[in-house]
Structures are given as structure tokens and as C-alpha cells.
Amino acid sequence: MCLNKCALPDYLSEAGVVAVIIKPAKGVMFMLILGCLIVLAALFLLVKRYEARMVLVCAGIVMCLASGAPMKALDAFAKGMGSGMISSACSSMGFALAMRFTGCDKHLINALAKLLLKVNWLLIPGVIFGTYAVNVALPSAAGTAAAAGAIFIPILMGAGVHPAMAAAAVKCGTYGSMLNPGLAHNPFVAKIAGVNVMDVIAFHYKANIASLIVGAVVLTAIAYFLKENKGHVVEGLELDTEFKVNPLYALMPIVPIAILILGATKMVPVFKMGVAQAMVIGAILTCIVTRTNPAALTKSFFDGMGKAYGDIIGIILAAGVFVAGMNAMGLVKAFIAAMTNNPSIVKICASVGPFLLGLITGSGDAATFAFNEAVTPHAADFGMSIVQMGSMATLGGTLGRTMSPIAGATIIVAGIAGISPMEVTRRNAIPMVFAMIIGMMFLAF
């Protein structure tokens, strides 16, 4: 009988192979089947929108207990709490909350809105690109949907665009955070690959922009085909045309990004620094420019950091426990062995898997973090680089979430437009599928 060593779980030693030969791998097969059932149960609960962190942690602990190695789950949890990406994710969200507190995000959005109103025929693609730009600076899909949607959706509806199409245009641009160094997935992949976070963004930015252009073109074409680009009058809609944009306030949200880009490209060598340092500098400059109470701004910054630890780092910790459970059951080794024997499916798994999970759960984070921690470190075995595979998984999960009817950002824009979230998904489905295909072509070849 041929045994694939890669399929053996951690609890089997080299000598354990003898036992497997004597008892034709019944124990191994039982553990693999049990592990698969637990994973499927976890996926079912995620689809049913149970608390993602609870589901992942519980599933990981159960798998570790079943394998006879309960401490592996706790060790993974403890290890994750000291993760190097905490500073990037937390400082980024702290800065985003500081921008909301000072109102600088509104100045940036209104500045973009005034430009869009001057070119009426570019309203829909312009809103998509504008929302994307806002999301680059403020890396929260739901936060961007709320901030940008409150301005852009009324502008589009006031110009005669169908409410559902207006909401879909904003939602289509809510994955600009892929280009933000503070997005947790970027430093996560960078850490695995042993490279700088800006190196990861430099690798996938062309794919992101290409996917955005394709998505914007397809959605605009759908709007023209359905005749939803004009002629839909909404009574009682009033735009805040009196809002006065302060150019300095509007520039504040992009200060950290500008510092990081100028430093990483060595255009201004003194600006070469980490994400956390850039975010703190941005917050300090914002405090000076807006003359905000320093104590109040500091509180909002740290409130954002705490929210990031609970929401973003929490999912990373939970995904680590889940992966520890899969490792203990032998699922990861079996999966890697299967892909090693069929390398042609790896690129499909890396993108389509997180995309589908993002679509059906409303969040691509859990699936993407789990995939990147379990499989991406072995990218070289499949003829891919770690950054390449990690970027494919991240973009796939992000686009799936952008298309999902149960994502927080979808629900927010639908509420602003006064329509059903499914109406947003119906219009965004085809653009996001095309965006994924083009994006993956850029990353895979």
C-alpha cells in the first residue's frame, strides 16, 4: 500500500508509519473524515452568520481535543496575541476613527463629490473611483460605505440615477483598502513572506486597479443597458450644496498613505517608516490643522485601536486557532499533499475559495486568513511565490465580500438608498465576477 507522508497528522511520529501499515490507516482516515466534518460544520455556522470568532475558536479547540493535543489551540491563541501586524491594523483603524471624529473624512468626500458633479456623464464610474480612493485612505468597507454613501448616493439619485444603481456604485468601490498598508491582510502576507508590507502592495496593485477599471466599466454598461443611469427622479431629495470644503482638512486622510508611498519609493528617504509611525504622524498633523482638543482626538484614536484589536486581530487569532486544529487533525498536510499532486488547481483554490466564502458569509477575512496561514507558506511547492498566492487569496475574499448581500457595507448603502441589499448584489454580481477574473489573470501570470 502506498502511503503519502504529507497526509499524516502531527500526532503521528515517524515510527507511527509502522502502526499505519499494520492497521491500514483506519485511524488516520477517521481523523481526516472527522476533521472535514468539523470544518464543514464551521462553514455552515459561518454561512448562518454565527459569530465568526466564536465559530473558528470552538472548531479549532474541538479538533485539537479530538487529536489529543488540546494545548495546540491555546498555544496558537497565545502566539497570535503577540503578532507583529497588530501595530499596523490597530494604528490604521485608530487613524480612521480620528478622521471621522474631526470630520476630515467628510471634507475629502465632499471635495470628490464637487468634482464629479462637473462631469455628469462620468457620475457612476466617478463615484466608484471616488469611493475606492476614500477606502484606500480609510480602510474600513463599512465605514467607507457609511461616509461615502451618505454623500455620493444622494448625488447620484439627485442626478436621476436609479437608487439601487447608486448604492451599487458606492459598494463597487469598497475594496480600495487593498492598497492600504494598514489592511491586516497585507502585513499578514508580508510577515509570512519575510518582506516589507509595501512590497506586497507593489506586487498586487496593478491587479487591483485593473479589476477596479473592469468592474466600473461593466457596472456602467449595465446601468446604461437597464436605463438606470438617468431619469429616475426621487422627490424630496436635497443635497447639501452649502458644505464648504477645507482643502487642508480634505488632505489629512491621505497624509499617512502619502508618507508611506514617498518613503517606500525612496522619493523622500526620510519618510521611510512603519505604518504605525505614519498613522501617528497623520493624527498629530490632523490635530494641529483642525485645532481639535488633543485629549478628545487621542481618545478617538485609541478607541479605534481597540475596535481593530477586537474585530480584526480577533479574527486573526481565531483563524490561527482554527488552523492549529486542522494541523492537529492532519487536514492541512492532506490538503497540501492533494494540491501537490494536482498543482493545476492551486491557483483556482487560492482565489475562488475565499471569493465564495466572502460572498456567502459577508466577510472574506476568516477564509482568507485561514487559507493564508495554512496553505500560503507552502506556495513554493506549487510553483508560486508566497506574495503571489497570498495576494490572490486576499483579492478573492475582498471581491466576494464586495458582492455579498449580507456584508455590512452592502446593508449600509442599501439602507441609505432605501432599497433591498439583494438589489445591490444583483447589479454588482457580474462586475465583481469580471473583476475577479481579470484580477486573477494579472496575479497568476
What feature does the model see in each segment?
Residues 153-248, 409-445:
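Membrane-core helix-loop-helix motifs of multi-pass transport proteins
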Residues 54, 73-106, 276-280, 284-331, ...:
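Core transmembrane alpha-helical segments of multi-pass membrane transporters/permeases
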Residues 107-110, 142-155, 183-194, 365-378, ...:
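Re-entrant/interfacial helical elements at transmembrane boundaries that shape
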Residues 32-36, 54-57, 121-129, 143, ...:
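Hydrophobic alpha-helical transmembrane segments
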Residues 88-91, 118-153, 316-319, 341-377, ...:
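Hydrophobic alpha-helical transmembrane segments of multi-pass integral membrane proteins
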Residues 15, 22-39, 56, 62-67, ...:
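Long, contiguous bundles of hydrophobic transmembrane helices that form the permeation core
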Residues 48-52, 83-85, 97-106, 135-147, ...:
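Short helix-coil transition sites and intra-membrane helix breaks within transmembrane domains
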Residues 29-33, 81-86, 112-129, 158-166, ...:
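Membrane-interfacial loop-to-helix junctions in multi-pass transporters
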